[in-house]
Amino acid sequence: VIINEPYEGMPAAEAGLKKGDMILSIDGESMVGKTTAYVSDHLRGEPGTTMVLKIQRPSTGKKMTVKVQRKAIQMPYLPYYGMQKDGIGYINYNQYLENSAKDVRRAFIDLKKQGMKGLVLDLRNNGGGSVQEALQILNMFIPKGRHLLSMKGKVKNANSNYNTTVEPLDTVMPIVVLVNEATASASEITSGTLQDYDRAVIMGTRTYGKGLVQIPNVSLPYNGKLKLTTAKYYIPSGRCIQALRYKHTDNGYVAENVPDSLTHEFRTAAGRIVRDGGGIKPDIEVKPDSLPNIAFYLSRVDTTDIMLNYEIDYIAAHPTVASPKDFELSDADYEQFKQRVVKSGFTYDQVSEKILKELESLARFEGYYDDAKPEFEALRQKLKHNIAKDLDYPYNKQKIKELIAADLMAAYYFEKGSLENSLRNDKQFAEAARLLGNPTEYQKLLQPKKEK
């Protein structure tokens, strides 16, 4: 088992373990040939206890003994924030855990001290968490006394209302909130409320649509657990963000998306039209770049270790590298990676080949295959695997270079370095920064469209 990514401030990193270190034994028991699950189980233990790991470091080939003290693992909910070009501040917030809003507040204050002119708040892939943390973040940007959230259930004691309770930090700083289909729950309360008050431009793709209040882990007999839904969320405009409805049928309840014909129209504070029943629709839709198939399969450590081994060798050959803001894998380094992939005999599933097989099957069924057989054969030859050619295709090459760079930055500078480096090629962030640099366009988006 090989260590992939030690996390900053966690036991592995504090003990000096690095990406690529091979675990040979734990407390004297050999781990050679053991499964990842087996090794992981032996790494776990009570916080405060210690274990002794014997590892082999690829950069030197030497075997080392390392003492590691276990502790409760808490992944960072604010893995990176920092100033970008042209006075644009960036905060990556990935989970609404207890006290996380305080870190967002501190980050915002720090960025303002550095001269921030506009903020990008990144809630992509933030699945939510504590509603109280969402309310605290909204208190930072919305005037005191404003309505933020209602919870409405079938019984009165499930109902509640929340308003801003303190003076805000800032009510004028231009803000763009980045969202995607994995932005859910408390993240949608934050982004939706900022949208309802015209306090920020929401950018990206439509959010998940989780508008239910739930009590998790209600204990049941025989070690059973129940997640109980008690109410729905309603944000200031009056809309509910829940995307699924549960329809009663003869076979029980069936979950289905709320059809557009049954959604309702609401208005923001400035009079812009917004709708319920499907998460938060961004003010500007910006789709991310798609990941090519070849890049997807090369990056999966469960199918191939080519990329991982290349990165381990790269780290061994480069004790230091450029900062995350400046680092880019060179074409010469990529060529070495390409040659390694070609020599390995690596193959992957091409979507075009799969579609061609489906088309052939359909043509046979409809009786047209024999007439078109020469064309099918010619197309099959054209689409035949050519790994070297696939790796040289400019878009594939760029995306693979970006993946390797992000992994390397995590090894040299931890997760924050990887996130900072990824902003170099982040289409959604680039559009957010561009918009914040254009005050007229930004303000126009927050005004209702003139009716014809």
Where in this protein do the model-derived segments appear?
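Polar, glycine-rich mid-to-C-terminal structural blocks
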Residues: 186, 198-199, 203-205, 209-272, ...
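Intrinsically disordered, low-complexity regions enriched in small/polar residues
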Residues: 9, 79, 92, 98, ...
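Cleft-lining beta-strand/loop regions that shape enzyme active-site pockets
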Residues: 2-19, 24-222, 232, 421
